[in-house]
Amino acid sequence: MGANNGKQYGSEGKGSSSVSSDVSSSTDHTPTKAQRNVATSEDSDLSMRTLSTPSPALICPPTLPGFQNGRGSSTSSSSITGETVAMVHSPPPTRLTHPLIRLASRPQKEQASIDRLPDHSMVQIFSFLPTNQLCRCARVCRRWYNLAWDPRLWRTIRLTGETINVDRALKVLTRRLCQDTPNVCLMLETVIVSGCRRLTDRGLYTIAQCCPELRRLEVSGCYNISNEAVFDVVSLCPNLEHLDVSGCSKVTCISLTREASIKLSPLHGKQISIRYLDMTDCFVLEDEGLHTIAAHCTQLTHLYLRRCVRLTDEGLRYLVIYCTSIKELSVSDCRFVSDFGLREIAKLESRLRYLSIAHCGRITDVGIRYVAKYCSKLRYLNARGCEGITDHGVEYLAKNCTKLKSLDIGKCPLVSDTGLESLALNCFNLKRLSLKSCESITGQGLQIVAANCFDLQMLNVQDCEVSVEALRFVKRHCKRCVIEHTNPAFF
């Protein structure tokens, strides 16, 4: 994606080049002038063209002899009627210093259907386009150029692609968007550059400097960014609420910069306004880093720490001390989290609605009892692969968390039909149930669930020894249920 502000982007010039060379590998997004130099090749560097909005070029039919006006624009504005055409004739065999030029009128072309739409409809259509496509639309004609840069379309920037020079694209874009408000881009609220591996600290620093109203930033999979860049963003964007740094392996902490902490900005105080934080696969994150994050991000409500393999129960203790408003928490695949960690999580009490502890092998019925006792409003629990959980833990969970809607206890070999019976008799609102690879489950347990949980929408019994009759029973009683199974006789 890209945008330009009317000048060439050479070295560190004040203007900006075609962003399309960075975003969509295309040419300048502003309608270009007809080339005056007849010796200029069509293969010249397209990314260095001027970005000013010209009047529609005079187009010569390619069949006319002596046509040497370079590349004529084939995308002249359809709103122009009775267009004048410059017809250049070859000079006669005499010594004439100038070619003879005569003007002729081209027959009026029928207006394209899309050009009949009013501006507000065009802006609405453009609002559904990704950023790089929007930049390409800006190249069609003058009207589209003006519409494509409507401020309402630039509340979000979304860049994708591993080969994009994201740092440069962000610099050019923010510069173009700052034309009406020098040095700041007040309309931009969301930046999504997930999977752009060429993003570095320089690109994030550009965002931090130019986007004070930023509310959402997603840089998942951008593994070249570091703590310092994240510090800049959270320090200079006081309204930031949503931050996704999943897969950013160099990020080990989130805090204010030293300068921001010293100045005690009235916008910040000492706190960061982030409510949603995803640090999945930040495998270098340790307890001390989580301590710092919790101390600065006290307003967190959604926190995802999947596969942060160095975290322990101590880190969860810090988290609960500072972040008392957490509603959703995932510590799945954190192998050092045990029942003691769940005891700390249980202190969130009825505020906790979503908990994922999948593949935390040290968790047993003891930890489940802590959560079930104090987190009575729990709606979602993923305990897949917690092999220490038995029917006793499931029974205690079912009796205390009666509003449970989604439960995953797959690969828990000690859970049997007894646990399913407790679920069926207490959790009538259950909609999703995964029992994948639960070796002790039989068709009898499934029938009890189906007879009581009529709203069941998804049932996973892959690699379970259940009969076709039991699966058909489930289908009859739970009409909307999608059954995932490995029984070839059932279809």
UniProtKB/Swiss-Prot annotation:
A GO cellular component term found in this entry reads: SCF ubiquitin ligase complex
Q: Where is the composition biased (Low complexity)?
A: 16-26
Locate the region Disordered.
1-79
Q: Which Pfam families match?
A: F-box-like, LRR_6
Give residue ranges of the LRR repeats.
185-210, 211-236, 237-262, 271-296, 297-322, 323-348, 349-374, 375-400, 401-426, 427-452
Keywords in UniProt for this one?
Cell cycle, Cell division, Cytoplasm, Cytoskeleton, Leucine-rich repeat, Mitosis, Repeat, Ubl conjugation pathway
Pathway field: Protein modification; protein ubiquitination
Name a biological process GO annotation.
G2/M transition of mitotic cell cycle
All residue ranges annotated as the F-box domain in the record: 111-157
| Cross-referenced Gene3D superfamilies | 1.20.1280.50, Ribonuclease Inhibitor (3.80.10.10)
Q: Which family does it belong to?
A: Belongs to the FBXL7 family.
Q: How does it assemble?
A: Part of the SCF (SKP1-CUL1-F-box) E3 ubiquitin-protein ligase complex SCF(FBXL7) composed of CUL1, SKP1, RBX1 and FBXL7. Interacts with AURKA; interaction takes place during mitosis but not in interphase. Interacts with BIRC5; this interaction allows BIRC5 to be polyubiquitinated by the SCF(FBXL7) E3 ubiquitin-protein ligase complex.
Record's function text = Substrate recognition component of a SCF (SKP1-CUL1-F-box protein) E3 ubiquitin-protein ligase complex. During mitosis, it mediates the ubiquitination and subsequent proteasomal degradation of AURKA, causing mitotic arrest. It also regulates mitochondrial function by mediating the ubiquitination and proteasomal degradation of the apoptosis inhibitor BIRC5.
Q: What is this protein called?
A: F-box/LRR-repeat protein 7
Q: Which organism is it from?
A: Mus musculus (Mouse)
The lineage, from the top, is: Eukaryota, Metazoa, Chordata, Craniata, Vertebrata
